[in-house]
Structure formats: structure tokens, C-alpha cells
């Protein structure tokens, strides 16, 4: 009888403990970090719990108005339905303050989309755009980087919110 009780107690304990252990494993497994690195090695983006795959070879998926020769990263997460790209726009022709002022003016003059421009730092400025097209609202969150070269890093989607897009680019680093 004691043996039956101790086996029952052990099974009860196991049953009570298993979900917590399973949850711990699930949380650890689900908190993965994927690091996306541009072809030139200058830009890295660490994204939590993502499934991005390289699509740069698929020219049909290249962002409009970005020359293929400038693209140095193009990744898509089919589960989140978010695409990220990095473009190297060549050597900086002006100082950062002038570049960001000109970029802000150019963005705000485009009346086909809603634009929100963030405050520029020494070498970065973020901005958001959204516009309606035949698929619905197209959201884009970008970070312009002014270094020796000018980089544009953007996340875009017809399905993700601006907040979700900004979260994807939250851990962006630049190697100098």
C-alpha cells in the first residue's frame, strides 16, 4: 500500500511539475535571436523569435525605387509577413545635419503617403510612411544612417503595424 501511495505521489508531482518544465522549455525555445547581416558586413539586425530568409536573389521581390546594385540585404519572414532591406546609397556628399534636413523635406513633399519623421541624432534618423494601395495599407519603418556611406534600413508590410516594424529594427548595429 505504501508503494502504491508513493508511486501515486510521484505521478502527482510529475504531473504537477511537467507543465512548468514544459513552459520553461517553450519560453527558452521561443526566445531565439536571429541576426541578419548585410553583404558588406556593416549592418547587423538582431530580431527575436523570427523566421527571416534571404530573398535577395528574387528580383521580383526587390523594393521599388531601390536599385538592385544598392541592395545589400533583403530578408522576408513569411510568418510575420515582414520584409527587411538594407541599401548602401553610396558615399555621403554632405554632413549629417544637412542630409537629414534634405531627406525630411523630400519625405514630407511626397503627398501620396503619410509620413512621420523622428528626431535626427548624430548619424541616424528614423521615419515611418504608410499609404493605401490595392492590397490595403502599406506600412514602412526606416532608419537612415549617415556614415562614410549613406544607408537606408527599412522594414515593411501590408500586415504588420508601425510598432511591430519598429520593433524588428530595434536592435540594429553598425560596424565601423
Question: What residue ranges belong to the model's regions?
Answer:
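Detector for intrinsically disordered, low-structure N-terminal pre-sequences
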Residues: 3-6, 32, 46, 114-116
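N-terminal regions of proteins, emphasizing targeting and processing segments when present
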Residues: 8-11, 47, 88
Amino acid at each position: 500500500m505504501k508503494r502504491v501511495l508513493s508511486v501515486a505521489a510521484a505521478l502527482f508531482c510529475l504531473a504537477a511539475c511537467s507543465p512548468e518544465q514544459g513552459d520553461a522549455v517553450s519560453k527558452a525555445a521561443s526566445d531565439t535571436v536571429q541576426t541578419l547581416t548585410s553583404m558588406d558586413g556593416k549592418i547587423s539586425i538582431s530580431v527575436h523569435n523570427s523566421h527571416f530568409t534571404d530573398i535577395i536573389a528574387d528580383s521580383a521581390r526587390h523594393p521599388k525605387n531601390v536599385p538592385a546594385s544598392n541592395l545589400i540585404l533583403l530578408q522576408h519572414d513569411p510568418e510575420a509577413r515582414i520584409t527587411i532591406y538594407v541599401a548602401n546609397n553610396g558615399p555621403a556628399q554632405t554632413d549629417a545635419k544637412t542630409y537629414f534636413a534634405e531627406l525630411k523635406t523630400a519625405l514630407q513633399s511626397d503627398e501620396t503617403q503619410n509620413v512621420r519623421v523622428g528626431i535626427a541624432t548624430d548619424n541616424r534618423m528614423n521615419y515611418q510612411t504608410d499609404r493605401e494601395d490595392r492590397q490595403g495599407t502599406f506600412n514602412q519603418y526606416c532608419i537612415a544612417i549617415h556614415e562614410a556611406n549613406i544607408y537606408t534600413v527599412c522594414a515593411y508590410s501590408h500586415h504588420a503595424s508601425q510598432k511591430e516594424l519598429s520593433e524588428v529594427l530595434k536592435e540594429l548595429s553598425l560596424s565601423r
